[in-house]
C-alpha cells in the first residue's frame, strides 16, 4: 500500500485522472454551459455549423441543468424530430462534398458559401410547412423547413414529415417526388403517399 503524507493524491488539482471519465460521470460542466465556463473551449468548429437553435436548447437542457438532475433532461421523444429537422436544413457542397446549414453566411464572402471551401451554395429548393391557428391564420414560424439542392436531371424525394406531424414510424416515407430536367420541374405524389 502506498501512502503519501502530503495529502490525498485524488485532491490534487493537476492529477493524471482521465478527464473523459470525469466528463462521462457528470463531474465537469458541458463545454457550452451557460452558467459555468470551467470546461469551455475555444477550439473546434463554431456551434452555428453544428447545431440548430432546437438542438442547442436540447443539449443545454441535457448537459446544463440535466447534468446533475436527470429529471430536468428532455426525454428521448424530442431528439429524433430535432435531429431530422437539422438534417433537413443541410445542403451538400458541390466543391468539397461537406454538409452545412443552407442559411450559413460565410464571414469572408458575406454570402451563402461553403464554410469549408468557400464554394457558392448550389441552387436549393426550400419547402416550408406551417401549423395553423384557426382556419386562415398560420403561426408565424414554419413548423418544418426542408431544403435540398436540385441538380439538373435529379429526383428529389420529399418525406412525409414535411407535410404531416413527425412520427418515428413513417416520417421518412416518400410523400412527394420532384424531378428536374430539360423540360422543367415535375412534382408528383409518391406511390407510397397517403391518400
Predicted segments with their positions:
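Long, charge-rich C-terminal accessory regions
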Residues: 125-152, 156-158
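Short Cys/His-rich micro-motifs in 6-15 aa windows
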Residues: 116-127
